[in-house]
């Protein structure tokens, strides 16, 4: 499917299949007991120039594969006045329990990589952002101009700002919870006029993309802010809806566990229907390896989920 990159497959299906939109449905793409609410999902881009007028030079800074993932690692090429770079890097890595790599390009140019831990972009607190940690290290040196602004925003504002407090965009809804922010992709090239940091933001009902963008535009050092064309608004199916009640009843019968509604920052195909939810397949006692290296599930859990789905489908269509 195209679920991780744009959902164009479902757009095509609904447009060409020639059938009316289903009355209800569920997607087995999350966790039990149920996900009946999903926060809005947008990506905002912070734009910076390429002025590099400092005693230290930032030639490039890259990190992250997708906006909806915490960058596992980030790499920078730097030169100029970088006193005791190797020593500071080693001490920094030990202090924060990070892995790193450093190599020389020439006598005064270095390539540095900080290795953290990836996680799903809806739960950035579960990861270790290689990009913001690398910026935190480099921000100790005398960079100038846009390079300095780029590093300062990443190090002082974005680093561990999982709810957007330092960005000035924090918001909490009583039903859907707090906004979350993941600095997902970093791209700085001193030869390019436009350099960016991509922020994946999961927001509850009560705020909106324009309000969020207006807040980001106030961040010192940012030249401009742009919004990705792709995004989703908040989605919620009430707990007393027959679909939700039926699925929770089946879950309780099959597992002996109490069911309850949940709202997540992640996005599933469930939100494509007005009465759509996510239902499984991860169980509450399972270790979440989603979007991480060596992602896996136990075969026993697949059988448990299949039994739940079989009864759920029967109850919904009988």
Segments (PLM) and residue ranges:
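Acidic/histidine-rich catalytic neighborhood of metal-dependent amide-processing enzymes
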Residues: 1-51, 90, 161-175
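Structural signature of cysteine-dependent C-C bond-forming condensing enzymes
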Residues: 15-24, 52-53, 59, 93, ...
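Short glycine-/aliphatic-rich beta-strand segments at the starts of folded cytosolic domains
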Residues: 42-44, 69-77
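Short amphipathic alpha-helix segments
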Residues: 46-59, 83-97, 163-178, 210-218
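Short beta-strand-to-loop capping motifs
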Residues: 48-50, 78-82, 114-116, 201-203
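Short, solvent-exposed loop/linker segments at the N-terminal edge
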Residues: 67-70, 191
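Self-splicing inteins and homing endonuclease
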Residues: 104-117
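An extended, acidic, His-containing surface patch that forms the Zn2+-binding/catalytic region
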Residues: 122-192, 198, 202-211, 217, ...
């Amino acid at each position: 499917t195209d679920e991780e990159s744009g959902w164009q497959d479902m757009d095509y299906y609904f447009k060409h299949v020639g059938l009316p939109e289903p009355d209800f449905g569920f997607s087995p793409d999350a966790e039990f007991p149920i996900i009946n609410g999903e926060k809005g999902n947008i990506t905002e881009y912070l734009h910076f120039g390429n002025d590099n007028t400092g005693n230290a030079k930032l030639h490039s800074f890259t990190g992250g594969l997708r906006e909806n993932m915490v960058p596992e690692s980030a790499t920078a090429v730097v030169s100029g006045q970088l006193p005791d770079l190797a020593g500071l890097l080693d001490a920094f890595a030990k202090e924060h329990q990070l892995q790193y790599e450093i190599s020389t390009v020439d006598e005064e140019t270095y390539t540095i990589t900080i290795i953290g831990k990836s996680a799903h972009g809806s739960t950035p607190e579960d990861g270790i952002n290689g990009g913001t940690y690398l910026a935190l290290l480099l921000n100790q040196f005398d960079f100038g101009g846009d390079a300095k602004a780029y590093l300062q925003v990443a190090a002082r504002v974005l680093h561990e700002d999982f709810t957007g407090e330092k960005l000035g965009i924090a918001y909490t809804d009583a039903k859907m919870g707090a906004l979350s922010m993941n600095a997902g992709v970093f791209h700085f090239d001193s030869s390019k006029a436009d350099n960016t940091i991509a922020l994946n933001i999961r927001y509850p009902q009560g705020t909106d993309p324009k309000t969020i963008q207006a807040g980001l535009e106030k961040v010192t050092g940012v030249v401009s802010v742009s919004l990705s064309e792709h995004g989703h608004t908040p989605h919620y199916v009430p707990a007393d809806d027959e679909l939700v009640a039926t699925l929770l009843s089946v879950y309780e019968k099959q597992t002996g566990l109490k069911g309850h509604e949940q709202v997540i920052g992640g996005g599933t195909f469930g939100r494509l229907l007005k009465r759509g939810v996510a239902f499984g397949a991860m169980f509450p006692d399972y270790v979440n390896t989603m979007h991480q290296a060596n992602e896996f599930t136990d075969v026993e859990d697949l059988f448990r989920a299949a039994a739940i789905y079989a009864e759920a489908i029967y109850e919904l269509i009988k």
